[in-house]
Design a protein with these regions (language model features):
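Bacterial N-terminal signal peptides
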Residues: 14-23
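Extended glycan-interaction surfaces of carbohydrate-active proteins
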Residues: 40-138, 162-181, 235-325, 365-443, ...
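Aromatic/His-enriched, Gly/Pro-containing loop or helix-boundary segments
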Residues: 171-214
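Inter-helical turn/loop segments and adjacent helix faces that build the functional surface
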Residues: 201-212, 340-355, 458-461
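Long, repeat-rich segments with strong aromatic
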Residues: 320-347, 441-449, 454-458, 462
Length: 528
C-alpha cells in the first residue's frame, strides 16, 4: 500500500509527465503530425499485420491458447460446425499442412449443446484473420473493427475482406459473431460493428454483388441483439447477456494474480471487505456461505460480452451489467440500423431501407430520451430495473457523437465536459480509479478513436486534434522506449507499465497490438 511518504514523489512524477507531454506534443500539434518522426512506428504497424495474421496454412500457430492449459503430447483440438464438411476441412488442412502435422490435430464436430463442452479448442474459420496479440491468439469481435480500420488505412484490402468474410461465416455456422473463435466463447458475442466493417470495405471495393450477399447475415445478427435474452421488451433497448452459466473457463484457468488467486477469488474477497451500495449485493454474493451466486457468474460473463472487463461502470465488479441498457451497445445498434438502411438504398430496396431507417429513428429517440442527462451534459447507461441513469462518468458518452445521434446542443455539452476525461496522454476511460483496467487512469485506443471522431463530426476540430495528438505522442514515446505497441496505457502518467495498478482481471499489458495499431493510424490520418 502506498503511504503518505510517496506523495511528494508522485507529485513530482505528475509534474514531470505534464512537462514531458508538452515537449512531446510540440511536433504533434493540432496543425498536423511529423510524419518522419512517426515513420518507424508506422513501419512497425505495417509489419505487424503479417505477424499477427493467423491462417489455416499456419494453423499450428493459431491453435495454441495462452489462456488454457494443455498437457504435453495432447492433440490440438479444432472444432467445426455440424453444417461444415469434415472431409472438406480435413482435406484442405492436409494440403496446407501435410500429413505429419495433421497427426497433431484432432478435428471435432461441435455437439448440439455447445455449452456442455469441457475440452476446449479453436473454432475453424475459412479465411486468414488478424489477432490482437499476446494472450489473445484468436479473432475477436470488436477488436476486429479497429484492426480493419488500420488494414484499410494501410491498403490491406484483401486482409480486411477476409476479416469480414470470417464474421459472415461465424454468423451462419456459430449463430453470431463470437467474442472470439474459441469454444468457451460460443455463449457470447461482443459490441457489434459488423455493418461498419461491411460499409467501410464496400467503400473501397464497390463490389455490389458482394454487398448483396451480406444482407442475410446482417438480418440474423441484428435479431441476435434485438430478441431475448438481449432485448428489454418494455424498454425498447438492448443489453449484454451471456447465454452460459457458471465460471468462465478461461478466467478460472488464466486470470490469476501473483498469489495464484483467480478473478473469482478476488471478487469474493472484495465482497467480504467492502460495503456494496451500487446494487443488491445478495443477488451476486451469498455472505453466509462466502459464495458467488449463479447470477454473479451470469453477470460476469455478460460483462465480458460488453468488452469492458472489468470496470465499475455497472457497479462493483461490473456484474450488474445484465440490468442495464448500455449507451455503447444501443448506439452501435443504431449504427447497424442506419448502416443497413444505407446498404438497402445502395441495393435499390427502398422499402427495406425505409424500415431500417424507422428503427434507427426510434432508437435514436430512445437514447436521447432515456440516456441523456441534461443536468450533467453527458450520456449515461440506463438501469432497466430502477428506471434510472447510473451517473458514472465513462468515455462511452462519446459514442452518440461518433454515431451522429446527439443534437448540436448535446454535443456541445459533452464537449464542455471533456476536461473531466482529458489527461496528459489522452482520454481517460472513466473518472474513477477503481483498480479495474477499464477505469482511470487507463486509456484505450478504441475509445480515443471514437471520441476524437465524435468531436470532429460536430466541428470540435481543435479538441479532436489535441486529444489525438496526446494519445499518438504517448504511443510513440512508449514505442521509442520499448519497441512495441501495447493494449492499454496509463494516460495520466503517460506510460505502458500498468500492472501494479490493476487489481482485477489480468494485469499484464499485451503486446501487438491490433486495435491500438488500427486506431493510431486513424488518429494520425485525422490530424493531417
Amino acid at each position: 500500500m502506498r503511504t503518505d511518504q510517496t506523495k511528494p514523489r508522485r507529485i513530482l512524477t505528475a509534474v514531470f509527465a505534464l512537462l514531458l507531454a508538452a515537449a512531446t506534443l510540440a511536433p504533434l500539434g493540432s496543425q498536423g503530425v511529423d510524419q518522419a518522426r512517426l515513420q518507424p512506428l508506422r513501419e512497425y504497424i505495417k509489419m505487424s499485420w503479417s505477424t499477427l495474421t493467423r491462417s489455416n496454412r499456419d494453423l499450428l500457430q493459431a491453435l495454441p491458447d495462452p489462456k488454457m492449459p494443455r498437457k504435453p503430447g495432447e492433440p490440438w483440438l479444432l472444432y467445426i460446425s455440424p453444417q461444415e464438411s469434415r472431409t472438406r476441412v480435413q482435406d484442405e488442412l492436409t494440403r496446407e499442412l501435410g500429413a505429419d502435422a495433421m497427426k497433431r490435430i484432432e478435428i471435432r464436430v461441435l455437439p448440439r449443446d455447445v455449452l456442455s463442452i469441457r475440452e476446449h479448442g479453436l473454432l475453424y474459420l475459412p479465411r486468414p484473420y488478424v489477432v490482437p496479440g499476446g494472450r489473445f491468439n484468436e479473432m475477436y469481435g470488436w477488436d476486429s473493427y479497429f484492426i480493419q480500420v488500420g488494414l484499410l488505412r494501410d491498403g490491406e484490402i484483401a486482409r480486411a475482406r477476409d476479416m469480414v468474410e470470417n464474421f459472415l461465416y461465424e454468423i451462419v455456422h456459430y449463430g453470431t459473431i463470437l467474442n472470439a473463435n474459441r469454444t468457451y466463447y460460443l455463449s457470447r458475442s461482443q459490441p457489434p460493428f459488423l455493418t461498419r466493417m461491411i460499409l467501410e470495405l464496400y467503400e473501397r471495393t464497390g463490389d455490389k454483388a458482394w454487398l448483396q450477399g451480406t444482407v442475410p447475415a446482417i438480418d440474423r445478427y441484428y435479431r441476435f441483439w434485438t430478441t431475448a435474452p438481449h432485448d428489454v421488451p418494455d424498454v425498447g433497448l438492448s443489453r449484454y447477456f451471456d447465454r452460459g452459466t457458471g465460471p468462465a473457463p478461461e478466467v478460472v484457468a488464466d486470470e490469476k494474480d501473483e498469489r495464484g488467486r483467480t478473478h473469482y477469488d478476488r471478487a469474493r474477497e472484495y465482497y467480504r471487505t467492502h460495503d456494496v451500495t451500487d446494487y443488491d449485493e445478495a443477488l451476486y454474493y451469498d455472505s453466509r456461505r462466502d459464495r458467488l451466486t449463479d447470477l454473479f457468474y451470469k453477470g460476469d460473463r455478460s460483462m465480458r460480452e460488453s468488452g469492458f472487463d472489468p470496470s465499475s461502470r455497472f457497479g462493483a465488479l461490473n456484474v450488474d451489467v445484465i440490468h442495464y441498457a448500455p449507451v455503447c451497445l444501443n448506439t452501435l445498434l443504431y449504427v447497424m440500423e442506419d448502416d443497413a438502411a444505407r446498404i438497402m438504398d445502395t441495393l435499390g430496396d427502398s422499402s427495406a431501407a425505409r424500415a431500417w431507417r424507422q428503427r434507427a429513428a426510434s432508437r435514436r429517440d430512445l437514447i436521447n430520451t432515456m440516456m441523456w442527462d441534461e443536468q450533467a451534459g453527458l450520456y449515461y447507461d440506463y438501469n432497466v430495473r430502477t428506471r434510472q441513469l447510473r451517473r458514472y462518468d465513462f468515455a462511452t458518452t462519446y459514442f452518440p457523437l461518433w454515431a451522429g445521434i446527439a443534437s448540436p446542443a448535446q454535443a456541445a455539452r459533452v464537449r464542455d465536459n471533456l476536461k473531466r476525461f482529458e489527461a496528459p496522454g489522452g482520454l481517460l476511460t472513466s473518472t474513477e480509479v477503481t483498480g479495474n483496467q477499464w477505469d482511470a487512469p487507463f486509456g484505450w485506443a478504441p475509445l480515443q478513436m471514437i471520441a476524437v471522431n465524435g468531436l470532429r463530426r460536430y466541428g470540435f476540430t481543435d479538441d479532436a486534434n489535441r486529444l489525438a495528438a496526446k494519445f499518438v505522442a504517448l504511443v510513440s514515446k512508449e514505442f521509442d522506449e520499448h519497441g512495441t505497441i501495447v493494449e492499454k496505457y496509463d494516460v495520466r502518467r503517460r506510460e505502458s507499465d500498468v500492472a501494479a495498478d490493476i487489481k482485477f482481471g489480468y494485469s499484464a499489458n499485451q503486446i501487438g497490438f491490433g486495435w491500438t495499431n488500427g486506431a493510431v493510424l486513424d488518429l494520425i490520418a485525422g490530424m493531417k
